[in-house]
Amino acid sequence: MQIENHKEEVPFAHYEEKFRDLDPADVVSRLSAVKWDGQNFTVKLLGRTFLIAHPAYAITAVDGGNIPSLPTQTFLLRYLLECKDVAWTGTWKTFREMPWGELYIKPYTGRALTRAAFTFGTRLDAFRKAAEKMGAAPVSHGDAGYQFELVSGYHMQMLAWAGDEEFPPNAQILYSDNFAEGFVAEDRVVIADILISTIKANM
């Protein structure tokens, strides 16, 4: 693959190389929802199912739709390489409340919360329709709010408030508490970006 966008391509190439040496038995022992048929891993992301070939990486959408963006593919590689099942206790956390959240809160606010506020808070009806199209469950928080399953066992809530004459639109993203152990802070930023982009693509 010819590298044109180094910011996205270089991390992908790094994890693609590590993926070649991955032991499928190790993956399915850590991630109970991931299946391995001897040629492909089956992975579900935000309601869509993908086949990921191994050892020579290739990704296919089972629904025949578009394959994910390169940053999303990089995340899926990291998920297979590093993630594990962690039980959810049923509680929710903001990004700031999880390990290293305070350190990353400024870039996270701009990349995730402000973007979500002005993408969804200004178009609540379109947000609702997109979330429902993705199979998300409505929640009672915010002017509009929905719960999504990112990958098996890891849940997120996207909450949006419309602005008015005094206040701009607002948004909050909640993570099931197992994200604190299951994903590092950098991944939690990327995950928020993936969720926002996926909802937006369905609007």
Predicted regions and their residues:
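Charge-rich alpha-helical segments
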Residues: 1-18, 38, 56, 65, ...
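Short Lys/Arg-enriched alpha/beta "domain-start" segment
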Residues: 1-39, 71-72, 80-134
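Amphipathic, interaction-prone secondary-structure segments
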Residues: 27-55, 137-162
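Intrinsically disordered, low-complexity regulatory segments enriched in Ser/Thr/Pro
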Residues: 48-74, 161-186
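Domain-length accessory/inserted modules outside core catalytic folds
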Residues: 50, 104-112, 116, 140-142, ...
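Short, charged/polar micro-motifs that form catalytic or ligand-binding hotspots
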Residues: 62, 66, 117, 144, ...
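Ampiphathic alpha-helical segments that act as solvent-exposed interaction surfaces
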Residues: 67-89, 174-203
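Conserved binding-pocket/active-site segment within a compact domain
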Residues: 121-181
